[in-house]
Protein backbone atom coordinates (compact mmCIF):
# COMPACT_ATOMS: atom_id res chain seq x y z
CA UNK A 1 0.00 0.00 0.00
CA UNK A 2 1.54 3.29 -1.08
CA UNK A 3 1.41 6.42 1.06
CA UNK A 4 -0.85 8.11 -1.49
CA UNK A 5 -3.29 5.18 -1.51
CA UNK A 6 -3.22 5.00 2.28
CA UNK A 7 -3.99 8.72 2.54
CA UNK A 8 -6.79 8.50 0.00
CA UNK A 9 -8.44 5.56 1.76
CA UNK A 10 -8.14 7.08 5.21
CA UNK A 11 -9.37 10.50 4.07
CA UNK A 12 -12.50 8.95 2.59
CA UNK A 13 -13.20 7.04 5.78
CA UNK A 14 -12.62 9.95 8.11
CA UNK A 15 -14.77 12.24 5.98
CA UNK A 16 -17.65 9.80 6.44
CA UNK A 17 -17.42 9.90 10.23
CA UNK A 18 -19.83 12.27 11.91
CA UNK A 19 -19.32 11.54 15.59
CA UNK A 20 -17.33 14.22 17.43
CA UNK A 21 -14.18 13.11 19.16
CA UNK A 22 -13.11 16.03 21.31
CA UNK A 23 -15.93 15.89 23.88
CA UNK A 24 -14.62 12.70 25.48
CA UNK A 25 -11.09 13.98 26.03
CA UNK A 26 -11.89 15.07 29.57
CA UNK A 27 -13.43 11.73 30.53
CA UNK A 28 -11.53 10.13 33.39
CA UNK A 29 -10.32 6.61 32.73
CA UNK A 30 -11.49 3.92 35.13
CA UNK A 31 -8.40 2.46 36.77
CA UNK A 32 -9.54 -0.47 38.86
CA UNK A 33 -7.62 -1.74 41.85
CA UNK A 34 -8.70 -5.32 41.23
CA UNK A 35 -6.76 -8.26 39.90
CA UNK A 36 -7.88 -10.57 37.11
CA UNK A 37 -9.67 -12.57 39.83
CA UNK A 38 -11.76 -9.46 40.72
CA UNK A 39 -10.27 -9.21 44.22
CA UNK A 40 -7.79 -6.87 45.85
CA UNK A 41 -4.43 -8.53 45.45
CA UNK A 42 -0.77 -7.73 46.01
CA UNK A 43 0.05 -10.30 43.36
CA UNK A 44 0.48 -9.59 39.68
CA UNK A 45 -0.74 -12.24 37.21
CA UNK A 46 2.88 -12.47 36.05
CA UNK A 47 3.84 -13.90 39.46
CA UNK A 48 1.46 -16.86 39.20
CA UNK A 49 2.30 -20.02 37.22
CA UNK A 50 0.71 -20.82 33.87
CA UNK A 51 -2.90 -21.86 34.44
CA UNK A 52 -3.36 -19.83 37.62
CA UNK A 53 -4.45 -16.30 38.52
CA UNK A 54 -4.07 -14.25 41.72
CA UNK A 55 -6.83 -14.29 44.35
CA UNK A 56 -5.83 -12.25 47.38
CA UNK A 57 -2.33 -13.32 48.32
CA UNK A 58 -2.58 -16.76 46.69
CA UNK A 59 -2.54 -18.17 43.16
CA UNK A 60 -5.68 -20.10 42.24
CA UNK A 61 -5.61 -22.63 39.42
CA UNK A 62 -8.20 -21.97 36.71
CA UNK A 63 -9.90 -25.00 35.24
CA UNK A 64 -10.08 -25.12 31.43
CA UNK A 65 -13.52 -24.65 29.94
CA UNK A 66 -15.31 -25.98 26.90
CA UNK A 67 -15.33 -22.48 25.44
CA UNK A 68 -11.53 -22.12 25.37
CA UNK A 69 -10.07 -20.86 22.11
CA UNK A 70 -8.12 -23.45 20.11
CA UNK A 71 -4.36 -23.37 20.53
CA UNK A 72 -2.91 -20.81 18.13
CA UNK A 73 0.30 -22.20 16.66
CA UNK A 74 3.23 -19.93 15.85
CA UNK A 75 4.85 -20.36 12.44
CA UNK A 76 8.21 -19.22 11.14
CA UNK A 77 8.34 -16.70 8.31
CA UNK A 78 10.91 -14.29 6.90
CA UNK A 79 11.25 -11.06 4.93
CA UNK A 80 13.76 -8.45 3.85
CA UNK A 81 13.96 -5.58 6.32
CA UNK A 82 14.42 -1.89 5.54
CA UNK A 83 18.12 -2.42 4.93
CA UNK A 84 17.53 -5.40 2.69
CA UNK A 85 18.62 -7.93 5.31
CA UNK A 86 16.86 -11.30 5.43
CA UNK A 87 15.09 -11.51 8.81
CA UNK A 88 13.52 -14.69 10.19
CA UNK A 89 10.71 -14.24 12.73
CA UNK A 90 7.83 -16.10 14.37
CA UNK A 91 4.23 -15.10 13.76
CA UNK A 92 0.77 -16.48 14.50
CA UNK A 93 -1.48 -16.45 11.42
CA UNK A 94 -5.25 -16.20 11.44
CA UNK A 95 -6.85 -19.43 12.64
CA UNK A 96 -9.15 -21.13 10.08
CA UNK A 97 -12.11 -20.81 12.47
CA UNK A 98 -11.83 -16.99 12.51
CA UNK A 99 -13.50 -14.88 9.79
CA UNK A 100 -11.19 -13.41 7.18
CA UNK A 101 -13.39 -10.31 6.75
CA UNK A 102 -12.13 -7.47 8.96
CA UNK A 103 -15.67 -6.11 9.10
CA UNK A 104 -16.67 -9.12 11.23
CA UNK A 105 -14.86 -7.73 14.28
CA UNK A 106 -15.31 -5.03 16.91
CA UNK A 107 -12.56 -2.44 17.33
CA UNK A 108 -11.60 0.11 20.00
CA UNK A 109 -12.70 2.97 17.71
CA UNK A 110 -15.89 3.61 15.69
CA UNK A 111 -15.72 1.28 12.72
CA UNK A 112 -18.34 0.42 10.15
CA UNK A 113 -17.57 -1.19 6.81
CA UNK A 114 -14.12 -1.10 5.22
CA UNK A 115 -12.46 0.85 8.01
CA UNK A 116 -9.26 -1.23 8.05
CA UNK A 117 -7.00 0.33 5.43
CA UNK A 118 -3.96 -1.84 6.13
CA UNK A 119 -4.25 -5.32 7.59
CA UNK A 120 -2.00 -8.09 8.89
CA UNK A 121 0.36 -9.55 6.29
CA UNK A 122 3.31 -11.05 8.18
CA UNK A 123 2.01 -14.52 7.25
CA UNK A 124 2.53 -13.80 3.55
CA UNK A 125 5.63 -14.34 1.42
CA UNK A 126 8.19 -11.55 1.46
CA UNK A 127 7.18 -10.08 -1.91
CA UNK A 128 3.49 -10.00 -0.93
CA UNK A 129 3.96 -7.99 2.25
CA UNK A 130 3.20 -4.28 2.51
CA UNK A 131 5.81 -2.13 0.84
CA UNK A 132 6.46 1.58 0.75
CA UNK A 133 8.98 3.57 -1.25
CA UNK A 134 12.53 2.40 -0.64
CA UNK A 135 11.26 -0.40 1.67
CA UNK A 136 10.23 2.21 4.22
CA UNK A 137 7.47 -0.15 5.36
CA UNK A 138 8.31 -3.85 5.53
CA UNK A 139 5.43 -6.09 6.49
CA UNK A 140 2.57 -5.14 8.78
CA UNK A 141 1.79 -7.01 11.99
CA UNK A 142 -1.32 -5.05 12.91
CA UNK A 143 -4.42 -3.28 11.60
CA UNK A 144 -4.50 0.44 10.79
CA UNK A 145 -7.75 2.26 11.57
CA UNK A 146 -7.99 5.86 10.28
CA UNK A 147 -10.03 8.19 12.50
CA UNK A 148 -10.43 11.86 13.28
CA UNK A 149 -7.66 13.18 15.48
CA UNK A 150 -8.73 13.02 19.11
CA UNK A 151 -11.23 10.17 18.67
CA UNK A 152 -11.46 8.25 21.98
CA UNK A 153 -10.08 4.72 21.99
CA UNK A 154 -12.27 2.44 24.13
CA UNK A 155 -10.98 -0.83 25.56
CA UNK A 156 -12.50 -3.98 24.09
CA UNK A 157 -12.38 -7.29 25.94
CA UNK A 158 -10.74 -9.91 23.75
CA UNK A 159 -12.27 -13.27 22.86
CA UNK A 160 -11.98 -15.76 25.76
CA UNK A 161 -10.52 -13.06 28.03
CA UNK A 162 -10.37 -13.69 31.79
CA UNK A 163 -10.71 -10.56 33.94
CA UNK A 164 -9.71 -7.03 32.95
CA UNK A 165 -6.80 -5.74 30.89
CA UNK A 166 -3.69 -4.61 32.77
CA UNK A 167 -1.74 -1.54 31.66
CA UNK A 168 1.95 -2.45 31.33
CA UNK A 169 3.39 0.59 29.52
CA UNK A 170 2.49 4.17 28.62
CA UNK A 171 4.97 6.26 26.64
CA UNK A 172 6.91 6.56 23.38
CA UNK A 173 7.26 3.49 21.16
CA UNK A 174 5.05 3.62 18.05
CA UNK A 175 4.70 7.33 18.64
CA UNK A 176 2.77 7.71 21.89
CA UNK A 177 1.83 4.14 22.81
CA UNK A 178 -0.15 2.17 25.38
CA UNK A 179 0.56 -1.53 25.98
CA UNK A 180 -1.99 -3.69 27.80
CA UNK A 181 -1.83 -7.32 28.92
CA UNK A 182 -4.81 -9.66 28.50
CA UNK A 183 -5.16 -13.20 29.86
CA UNK A 184 -7.05 -15.53 27.49
CA UNK A 185 -8.29 -19.09 27.75
CA UNK A 186 -6.55 -20.88 24.91
CA UNK A 187 -5.86 -24.55 24.29
CA UNK A 188 -6.87 -25.70 27.81
CA UNK A 189 -4.55 -23.20 29.46
CA UNK A 190 -4.21 -19.49 30.15
CA UNK A 191 -2.07 -17.44 27.78
CA UNK A 192 -1.09 -13.79 28.10
CA UNK A 193 -1.34 -11.42 25.14
CA UNK A 194 -0.27 -7.83 24.58
CA UNK A 195 -2.31 -5.22 22.76
CA UNK A 196 -0.35 -2.29 21.35
CA UNK A 197 -2.23 0.96 20.75
CA UNK A 198 0.09 3.10 18.63
CA UNK A 199 0.36 6.69 17.28
CA UNK A 200 -1.90 8.14 20.00
CA UNK A 201 -2.43 11.86 20.35
CA UNK A 202 -2.39 11.25 24.12
CA UNK A 203 -3.12 8.49 26.64
CA UNK A 204 -6.17 8.73 28.88
CA UNK A 205 -5.80 10.96 31.92
CA UNK A 206 -4.28 9.06 34.83
CA UNK A 207 -3.40 5.97 32.81
CA UNK A 208 -0.28 4.29 34.23
CA UNK A 209 1.32 0.84 34.45
CA UNK A 210 -0.37 -1.35 37.02
CA UNK A 211 -3.85 0.04 36.35
CA UNK A 212 -6.66 -2.09 34.97
CA UNK A 213 -9.11 -1.32 32.18
CA UNK A 214 -12.62 -2.67 31.78
CA UNK A 215 -14.60 -2.94 28.57
CA UNK A 216 -15.39 0.58 27.37
CA UNK A 217 -12.77 2.40 29.46
CA UNK A 218 -10.80 5.03 27.55
CA UNK A 219 -7.26 3.98 26.62
CA UNK A 220 -6.32 7.21 24.87
CA UNK A 221 -7.04 9.33 21.80
CA UNK A 222 -6.22 8.75 18.14
CA UNK A 223 -3.37 10.83 16.73
CA UNK A 224 -0.39 10.82 14.39
CA UNK A 225 2.60 10.81 16.76
CA UNK A 226 5.41 8.94 15.07
CA UNK A 227 3.39 8.97 11.84
CA UNK A 228 2.99 12.62 10.80
CA UNK A 229 -0.19 13.43 8.85
CA UNK A 230 -1.33 9.78 8.91
CA UNK A 231 -3.90 10.03 11.70
CA UNK A 232 -4.86 6.49 12.67
CA UNK A 233 -4.81 3.83 15.37
CA UNK A 234 -2.18 1.14 14.93
CA UNK A 235 -3.61 -1.90 16.76
CA UNK A 236 -1.25 -4.84 17.22
CA UNK A 237 -1.66 -8.13 19.10
CA UNK A 238 1.22 -10.24 20.43
CA UNK A 239 1.30 -13.44 22.47
CA UNK A 240 3.77 -13.27 25.35
CA UNK A 241 6.16 -16.21 25.37
CA UNK A 242 5.88 -18.52 28.37
CA UNK A 243 8.23 -17.65 31.20
CA UNK A 244 8.70 -14.02 30.12
CA UNK A 245 8.39 -11.48 32.95
CA UNK A 246 7.33 -8.18 31.44
CA UNK A 247 8.22 -6.30 34.62
CA UNK A 248 11.89 -6.89 33.81
CA UNK A 249 11.63 -5.57 30.25
CA UNK A 250 11.57 -2.18 28.61
CA UNK A 251 8.83 -1.44 26.04
CA UNK A 252 10.99 -2.25 23.03
CA UNK A 253 11.97 -5.62 24.49
CA UNK A 254 8.33 -6.45 25.24
CA UNK A 255 7.56 -6.51 21.51
CA UNK A 256 10.80 -8.21 20.49
CA UNK A 257 10.40 -11.60 18.79
CA UNK A 258 12.40 -13.16 21.62
CA UNK A 259 9.77 -12.20 24.20
CA UNK A 260 6.46 -12.06 22.32
CA UNK A 261 5.09 -13.39 19.04
CA UNK A 262 3.18 -11.13 16.68
CA UNK A 263 -0.34 -12.42 16.06
CA UNK A 264 -3.05 -11.79 13.49
CA UNK A 265 -5.43 -9.56 15.50
CA UNK A 266 -8.43 -11.44 14.09
CA UNK A 267 -7.54 -14.37 16.37
CA UNK A 268 -8.31 -12.36 19.50
CA UNK A 269 -10.57 -9.41 18.60
CA UNK A 270 -14.23 -9.85 19.61
CA UNK A 271 -16.78 -10.58 16.92
CA UNK A 272 -19.61 -8.16 16.22
Where do the PLM segments sit?
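Sec-dependent N-terminal signal peptides
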Residues: 2-23
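Signal peptide processing junction and immediate N-terminal pro/mature segment
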Residues: 19-34
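Surface-exposed, glycine-biased beta-strand/turn segments
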Residues: 36, 40-176, 185, 215, ...
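Acidic, glycine-rich catalytic/binding loops that coordinate metals and/or anionic ligands
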Residues: 63, 73, 82, 190-193, ...
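Active-site scaffold segments
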Residues: 143-145, 198, 215, 220-221, ...
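Solvent-exposed coil/turn segments that connect beta secondary-structure elements
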Residues: 148-150, 183-185, 225, 238-242
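Zn2+-dependent peptidoglycan hydrolase active-site motif and core
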Residues: 156, 160-206, 231-232, 236
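Short hydrophobic beta/alpha edge segments that flank linear recognition/processing sites
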Residues: 178-180, 213-228
Amino acid sequence: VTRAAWLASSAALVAAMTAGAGSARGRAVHVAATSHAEALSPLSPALCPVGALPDGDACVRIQPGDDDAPEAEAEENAHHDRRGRWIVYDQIPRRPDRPADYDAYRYPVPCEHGCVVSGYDLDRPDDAQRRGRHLSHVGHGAVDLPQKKGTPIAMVALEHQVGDAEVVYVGPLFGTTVLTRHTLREGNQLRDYLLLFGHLDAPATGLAPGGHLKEGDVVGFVGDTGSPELVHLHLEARRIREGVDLTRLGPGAMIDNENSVVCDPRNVLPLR
